[in-house]
Amino acid sequence: MSECVVRGGQVVQAGGVVSADVAIEDGRISAIGPELPGAKREINARGLTVFPGVIDDHLHFNEPGRTEWEGAATGSRALAAGGGTAFFDMPLNSTPCTVDRAAFAGKRAALERASIADFALWGGIVPGNLSELAPLAESGVIGFKAFLSDSGLPEFPRADDLTLYEGMREAARLGLPVAVHAESEEITSRLTRRARDAGRTSARDYLDSRPVIAEVEAIHRAALLAREAGCKLHIVHISSGRGVAAALEARTMGTDIAIETCAHYLFFTEDDLLRLGAIAKCAPPLRDRQEFDRLWAHVLGGIVDVVASDHSPAPPAMKTGDDFFAIWGGIAGVQSTLAVLLEAGHFQRGLRLERIAELTAGYPARRFALHNKGSIAVGNDADLTLVDMDGQENLEPESLWQKHPVNPYTGNSFRGSIRRTMLRGTTIFNHDEITVKSGGQLLRPKANTYATSGIHP
């Protein structure tokens, strides 16, 4: 007799959606099939759709050091409420930044105390820390992150071209990928300075200071350096259809490049930024309707590999001011990635459920060598999200689990109601309640087993 059976759900697998039970033993899936034998504990999933737990490969929980912005305790609860079971925390916005072994150890300890979801940690590439990349790899980072433009934090300076190239060569030797924030510093900084010197500091001026060409140029440059270095490349938060096209062109030229976008680029346009204001400020910024539609075409066409949240919260006071350039740029959305893909993707555009599972779980697990995560298969961790596809969620500030109710998604309705989230067979979220206090574990990838980009079932 199994420990647990999730009974009678519509199970989303790579090959399609099947009616099946899912048996769980010792935190792992032990069987999948119709009418499995009884278990010590049964969860009724009849009428529900069972997805693999969301793996958010790009977010900022600010732990340790800036927990007044968020923290893993509240952040991981918001993740779980959105169907998430694992996350990859970026190396900046915490204090200290994760650019050496000691910082990694401190962040790992903080997350083990506070997180209810499993986690992996990105290390950083900044000028002067090349010798720290090997110790970070030994500690267990999932990969390395670099900025081509100003990060907004002086303690995490952007990587100049030589720093990036040498970092990529070292990452390739270590068998780990490099993630890049792709915006041209030359273009964005000079346009920003020109606007501010002229006293133009509105939201429209901010949008104009970060044009699509700044993203496209930086993607091409990062791809060239990665190709020369023999490094796997991960372009984070691509905001535009032209940006995806640039990454795809690099792939055809031999760059092993993964293409990530974020839920907010698939739900909002620049018109929403002008309407909502700083709550919707991010970098790269939201784009016009043409780029929005092009980006969706790449998602629907199977070109985009992964959709993340880039959850980057801040206290309300940091999201106000007369100078739009000075306001903190980051969107809080960790609770909404699956909701966006269900509403804007499946219900509005016909995006297949198995494609949603691939974008949110299958690809990040495969790409980052988390071989027991990302899909509902025998032997994998029982990381499951149960969704009532006939339900509807009206996202209001009081339904948010993040620390501050500063969120552009509030006031919107999403078809598909997340009813339960399970991590390794344990329910961590159930019917609007968090059911555990901790339990998240560090995910350590196996170096040199990362999947090649562009490979989808």
From Swiss-Prot:
Modified residues (N6-carboxylysine): 145
Molecular-function annotations in GO: allantoinase activity; cobalt ion binding; zinc ion binding
Cofactor detail note: Binds 2 Zn(2+) ions per subunit.
Reaction catalyzed: (S)-allantoin + H2O = allantoate + H(+)
Record GO biological process: allantoin catabolic process; purine nucleobase catabolic process
Annotated Zn(2+) 1 binding sites: 58, 60, 145, 310
GO CC field: cytoplasm
Biological or metabolic pathway of the protein: Nitrogen metabolism; (S)-allantoin degradation; allantoate from (S)-allantoin: step 1/1
Enzyme type, top EC level: hydrolase
EC number annotated for this UniProt entry: 3.5.2.5
Needed cofactors: Zn(2+)
Residues that bind Zn(2+) 2: 145, 181, 237
Alphabetical UniProt keywords: Hydrolase, Metal-binding, Purine metabolism, Zinc
Modification after translation: Carboxylation allows a single lysine to coordinate two zinc ions.
InterPro entries in alphabetical order: Allantoinase, Allantoinase_bact, Amidohydro-rel, DHOase/Allantoinase_Hydrolase, Metal-dep_hydrolase_composite, Metal_Hydrolase
Family: Belongs to the metallo-dependent hydrolases superfamily. Allantoinase family.
Subunit: Homotetramer.
Record's function text: Catalyzes the conversion of allantoin (5-ureidohydantoin) to allantoic acid by hydrolytic cleavage of the five-member hydantoin ring.
Designated name of the protein: Allantoinase
Organism in which the protein naturally occurs: Solibacter usitatus (strain Ellin6076)
